[in-house]
């Protein structure tokens, strides 16, 4: 699912065109689930094909039980007994270490093969039976995933599809991955329990406060311009990860958080109701406005839940103009035509769109499987268009969506703002400080991105506090969240992950010649002496014939030389004789 933001021009000349093209949407507390998908990749002639053959969702409570994945197959043709092999569940050494890229776990017939089974008495087979069965109702297949909670599914699991159990090579590769997606249709938001919402806000602010000192130190102007710290994408990523974890989005490990270089780092999330606690602008100092902040747009909805003012009444479910100038409470802002401010002047909003919003980092969440597919397309610019036709991608889930799904930005945050009298001053200050830190990041990234977009060397120096520790994917800077839920900055680890991503979606390589099969390879110590003996027996007659011909030739030449030797007349008398 691709997250969308609303970018509106600042000029007032084309207001109808702005909102005709992109209408902001309401946030209805969307639900997110872990979704499994199976993709089949095969070749016909010189053309490669890739198609998502089936999906299955875990329960809203998480992937706690075995999952049944229904799917179809396109590459097996009329074969009735296909076989699936995975490398991860092999127990034999030879099955795990021989011909991994070619056979994908089944170089021998004694390897762990998931042969198709018959339907069980209850209609489908349980995990105790064969996990790979045929669905007689739909004509497709069912694969039972016994451990959907395992991190390997988020990384992506690659398997081989064999037409039969005696096939030498797979006819296609199967990729199964688990991603975090928004559930459609989004259910209606429910009333939030006030004590729970207050507790959630307190937990969130405590995390923000613990990291605030370091962030403020990084963002505060130094005493000397020569000692100014460069902007760090890593700071933005860590801030977003902390907010996400504090908001209750769990299982964020073995994944990537990415920031787009050409997109603002902050996004304004519309709130469903007006701010309840308001004061006159004279009673509070007016904070500096923050321009060019996009408004988050939920693609599943067409209207905003609440607006203070709007040029078109159809854009909002409910509109209520303020009776006086207001000041937003801690953690909240007024969004008017891409500009954030803490105060709202009731006399100047009649011709503009103004909504109450919260502020979160604009990041994208990828699983390893998703990023591997995207990396394989970007590895060669010549093949991006061709591969994109056969490899549709679920790009990821916006961090703004994740926070909204957890209650922030809708019921929980709104109710907490309305109940600020029950919160301590320290909690209120922490929320406000967090928003100010993100606002400072917004101002820095706007100036930095303009220079970095034209100078990759400068960009490399600005990606992290201690060097280039982000993975560049097109125009996105991605950081890896390891198994501990922390941003990994180890360069060696990142390089290893980058190589794995480049190799993960490599096309199915042609199999080796028959004489290089693993079975034949094990017989080579016995076959080599036999082959040498056969070779000697084949060459011996030729060699003997050659040697015999050479001996005969040498004998003939020697005999002829003796016959043709020059004749010399023998003397008839003694030369020393004198008569």
Swiss-Prot record:
Cellular location(s)? Cell membrane
Transmembrane parts of this sequence: 524-544
**Region Surface protein, residue ranges:** 23-387
Q: What SUPFAM superfamilies does the annotation carry?
A: Virus ectodomain
Residue segments, region Fusion peptide: 388-408
Q: Which domain of life is it from?
A: Eukaryota
Keyword presence, Protein biosynthesis: no
Locus of motif CKS-17: 453-469
The domain-related comment in the record is: The CKS-17 immunosuppressive domain is present in many retroviral envelope proteins. As a synthetic peptide, it inhibits immune function in vitro and in vivo.
Function (record text)? Retroviral envelope proteins mediate receptor recognition and membrane fusion during early infection. Endogenous envelope proteins may have kept, lost or modified their original function during evolution.
Q: Which family does it belong to?
A: Belongs to the gamma type-C retroviral envelope protein family. HERV class-I F(c)1 env subfamily.
Q: Which PANTHER family match?
A: ENDOGENOUS RETROVIRUS GROUP FC1 ENV POLYPROTEIN-RELATED, VIRAL ENVELOPE PROTEIN
Query: Per its record, how is this protein called by name?
Result: ERV-BabFcenv provirus ancestral Env polyprotein
- State the organism's lineage: Eukaryota, Metazoa, Chordata, Craniata, Vertebrata
């Amino acid at each position: 699912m691709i997250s969308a933001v609303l970018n509106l021009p600042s000029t007032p000349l084309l207001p109808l065109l702005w909102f005709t093209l992109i209408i902001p949407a309401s946030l209805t507390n969307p639900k997110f689930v872990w979704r499994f998908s199976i993709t089949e990749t095969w070749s016909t002639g010189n053309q490669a094909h890739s198609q998502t053959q089936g999906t299955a969702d875990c329960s809203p409570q998480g992937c706690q039980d075995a999952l049944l994945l229904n799917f179809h197959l396109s590459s097996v043709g009329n074969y009735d007994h296909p076989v699936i092999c995975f490398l991860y569940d092999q127990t034999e050494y030879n099955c795990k270490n021989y011909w991994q890229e070619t056979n994908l776990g089944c170089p021998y017939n004694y390897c762990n093969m998931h042969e198709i089974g018959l339907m069980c008495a209850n209609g489908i087979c349980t995990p105790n039976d064969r996990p790979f069965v045929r669905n007689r109702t739909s004509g497709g297949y069912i694969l039972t995933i016994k451990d959907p909670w395992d991190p390997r599914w988020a990384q992506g699991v690659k398997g081989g599809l064999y037409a039969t159990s005696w096939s030498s090579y797979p006819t296609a590769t199967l990729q199964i991955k688990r991603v975090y997606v928004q559930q459609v249709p989004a259910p209606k938001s429910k009333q939030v329990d006030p004590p729970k919402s207050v507790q959630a806000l307190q937990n969130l602010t405590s995390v923000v406060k613990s990291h605030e000192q370091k962030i403020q130190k990084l963002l505060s102007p130094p005493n000397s311009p020569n000692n100014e710290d460069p902007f760090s994408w890593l700071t933005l990523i860590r801030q977003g990860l902390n907010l996400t974890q504090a908001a209750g989005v769990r299982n964020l490990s073995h994944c990537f958080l990415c920031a787009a270089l050409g997109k603002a780092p902050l996004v304004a999330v519309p709130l469903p109701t007006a701010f309840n606690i308001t004061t006159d602008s004279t009673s509070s100092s007016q904070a500096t406005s923050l321009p060019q902040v996009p408004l988050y747009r939920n693609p599943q909805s067409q209207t905003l839940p609440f607006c203070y003012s709007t040029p078109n009444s159809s854009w909002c479910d409910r509109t209520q103009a303020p009776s006086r100038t207001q000041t937003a409470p801690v953690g909240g802002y007024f969004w008017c035509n891409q500009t954030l401010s803490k105060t709202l002047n009731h006399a100047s909003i009649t011709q503009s769109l103004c909504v109450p919003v919260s502020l979160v980092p604009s990041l994208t969440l990828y699983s390893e499987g998703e990023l591997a597919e995207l990396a394989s397309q970007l590895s060669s610019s010549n093949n991006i268009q061709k591969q994109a036709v056969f490899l549709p991608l679920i790009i990821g889930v916006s961090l703004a969506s994740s926070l909204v799904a957890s209650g922030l930005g809708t019921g929980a945050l709104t109710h907490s703002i309305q109940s600020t009298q029950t919160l301590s001053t320290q909690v209120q200050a922490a929320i406000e400080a967090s928003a100010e830190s993100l606002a400072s990041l917004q101002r820095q990234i706007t100036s930095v991105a303009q220079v970095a977009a034209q100078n990759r060397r400068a960009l490399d120096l600005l990606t992290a506090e201690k060097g280039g520790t982000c993975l560049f994917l097109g125009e996105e800077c991605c950081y890896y969240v390891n198994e501990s839920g922390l941003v990994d900055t180890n360069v060696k680890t990142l390089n290893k992950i980058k190589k794995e991503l480049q190799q993960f979606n490599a096309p199915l390589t042609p199999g080796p010649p028959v004489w290089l099969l693993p079975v034949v390879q094990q017989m080579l110590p016995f076959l080599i002496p036999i082959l040498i003996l056969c070779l000697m027996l084949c060459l011996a007659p030729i060699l003997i014939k050659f040697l015999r011909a050479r001996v005969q030739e040498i004998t003939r030449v020697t005999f002829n030389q003796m016959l043709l030797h020059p004749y010399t007349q023998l003397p008839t008398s003694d030369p020393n004789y004198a008569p």
